[in-house]
């Protein structure tokens, strides 16, 4: 079976053609999702091209209406939040590390350039053009960042773009190449905050979307999630953001709004110098990325690269220290639907993937995780096998574990026999008792963190495992997360963000589960 998508790019029109008859079983299973995401990507690109230009789209009276169709995940309105941008490219992670690490000593040149930048931006200018000219002079002469004001093929005109030229294979003759420009940094600026009719952050978001939706970049969009940095400023204030293009646009601020005004404090200039050095490093990182992409074998095919929709972390070391490569196959989130926009939820749920040798895995991004507690339960078959842990940046870990076949969360599970809930709760009790004997508190003991699966010994019998060891801590020492959801989730009295974790609260949560799933069972599992 074949299906064809007509596409166009800088060179003559070509087609993306899939021969689904030659796919493996695993590839054939993913093919419907691949088709939907391919269509969603180009549908969004068409919508962006048909939308007003950035200066009109970002207007307060225009953006709310257009946002209903575009669904940019730029935190405005607050319901439109995507997964963290640092999941998707090393350049963003490097920027955050460099810009926030106070142990990094900026160079004397960067420090002096930051003083010049503050002196220039603290002045009062008669209009936006005058301020932008002063800003670009300092960025060019002092920091080596060149910006050009160009009109895009869809008639948009951002305030400034730091471009990089790469070589790409001709889609009709792969032995030949052509030159294309990609956006490394997109800048949008306003003369002052007061009186501005649009937010430079929103306008930069719109300019990014317009640049990467150009029809001539269709081939690049098929291979890359198009990472770029955004420089947003209003008067003597600026911030740096990151942006990617999945099946919609995701934008995250990577700094706070930083004042560009002279002070008597050295630390202020040090901070600005550190941020600007990090921006230059990100510029070089992204330029290197696009150079490598243009020369890669994947650019020689007409197929869309499905990995463009997922994070760039695709390797880990297993328990024996062996490097393992993997790829992503799906989202483990019901709300992450490619038709309704892949990431239109505040999702921190894991991904599903497959290693190079065919093992199905779960890939979880998290800020904290108790690997020791997970391994403790896994040894007794009370948690999925932990395959690897990778710290990709400060405060961000990637947890890789086995994918549990034929499993459902307890919340989703529909038993064929009533006593199957009893088997489930017996295993939950065993897991919590094991953790408690070793001084741990599980913390987030809810039906969504319990997987139910068939027992291999008996087809009608089921068993349960715990997942999500993010909260697990030591009894009386560690605390419940201050970010815990106390609005839509009812917790037993005593469980509060920032308060010490205690075993007795796990017992309370166990009792609640018992009442919900086995109220008919007279001899309570949890009575001492």
Write out the residue ranges for each language-model feature.
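Juxta-kinase regulatory segment immediately upstream of eukaryotic protein kinase catalytic domains
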Residues: 269-337
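Conserved structural core of kinase catalytic domains
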Residues: 375-426
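A short, conserved, highly charged catalytic patch centered on acidic carboxylates
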Residues: 90-222
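Nucleic-acid nuclease catalytic cores
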Residues: 197-201, 209-253, 394, 523-526
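C-lobe/activation-segment region of protein kinase-like
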Residues: 458-528
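Charged, often low-complexity linker/regulatory segments
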Residues: 5, 14-138, 263, 270-277, ...
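Catalytic-loop of the protein kinase fold
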Residues: 436-455
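ATP-binding glycine-rich loop module of kinase domains
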Residues: 322-384
């Amino acid at each position: 079976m074949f299906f064809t998508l007509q596409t166009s790019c800088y060179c003559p029109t070509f087609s993306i053609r899939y021969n689904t008859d030659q796919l493996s079983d695993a590839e054939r299973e993913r093919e419907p999702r691949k088709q939907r995401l391919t269509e969603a990507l180009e549908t969004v690109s068409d919508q962006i091209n048909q939308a007003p230009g950035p200066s009109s789209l970002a207007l307060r009276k225009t953006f709310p209406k257009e946002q209903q169709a575009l669904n940019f995940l730029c935190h405005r309105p607050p319901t439109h939040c995507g997964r963290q941008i640092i999941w998707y490219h090393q350049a963003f992670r490097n920027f955050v590390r460099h810009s926030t690490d106070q142990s990094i000593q900026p160079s004397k040149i960067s420090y002096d350039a930051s003083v010049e930048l503050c002196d220039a931006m603290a002045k009062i200018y008669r209009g936006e053009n005058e301020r932008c000219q002063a800003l670009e002079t300092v960025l060019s002469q002092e920091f080596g960042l060149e910006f050009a004001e160009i009109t895009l093929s869809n008639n948009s005109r951002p305030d400034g773009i730091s471009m990089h030229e790469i070589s790409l294979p001709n889609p009709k003759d792969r032995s030949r190449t052509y030159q294309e420009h990609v956006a490394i940094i997109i800048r949008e600026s306003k003369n002052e905050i007061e009186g501005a009719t649009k937010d430079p952050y929103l306008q930069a978001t719109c300019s990014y979307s317009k640049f990467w939706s150009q029809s001539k970049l269709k081939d690049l969009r098929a291979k890359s999630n198009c990472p770029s940095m955004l420089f947003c400023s209003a008067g003597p204030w600026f911030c740096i953001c990151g942006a990617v293009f999945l099946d919609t646009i995701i934008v995250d601020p990577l700094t706070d709004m930083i004042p560009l005004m002279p002070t008597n404090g050295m630390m202020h200039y040090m901070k600005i110098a550190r941020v600007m050095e990090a921006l230059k490093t990100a510029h070089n990182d992204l330029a290197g990325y696009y150079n490598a992409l243009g020369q890669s074998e994947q650019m020689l095919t007409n197929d869309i690269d499905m990995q463009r929709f997922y994070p760039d972390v695709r390797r880990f070391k297993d328990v024996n220290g062996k490097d393992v490569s993997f790829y992503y196959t799906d989202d483990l989130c019901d709300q992450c639907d490619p038709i309704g926009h892949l990431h239109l939820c505040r999702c921190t749920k894991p991904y599903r993937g497959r290693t190079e040798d065919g093992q199905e895995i779960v890939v979880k991004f998290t800020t904290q995780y108790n690997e020791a507690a997970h391994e403790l339960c896994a040894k007794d078959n009370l948690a999925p096998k932990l395959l690897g842990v990778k710290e990709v940046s400060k405060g961000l870990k990637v947890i890789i574990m086995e994918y549990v076949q034929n499993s459902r969360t307890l919340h989703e599970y529909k038993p064929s026999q009533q006593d199957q809930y009893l088997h489930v709760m017996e295993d939950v009790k065993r897991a919590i008792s094991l953790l408690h004997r070793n001084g741990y508190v599980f913390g987030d003991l809810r039906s969504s963190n319990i997987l139910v699966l068939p027992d291999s010994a008996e087809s009608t019998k089921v068993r349960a495992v715990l997942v999500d060891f993010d909260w697990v801590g030591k009894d009386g020492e560690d605390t419940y997360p201050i970010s815990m959801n106390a609005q839509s989730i009812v917790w037993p009295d005593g469980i509060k963000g920032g308060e010490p974790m205690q075993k007795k609260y796990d017992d309370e949560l166990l009792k609640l589960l018992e009442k919900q799933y086995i109220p008919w069972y007279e001899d309570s599992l949890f009575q001492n």
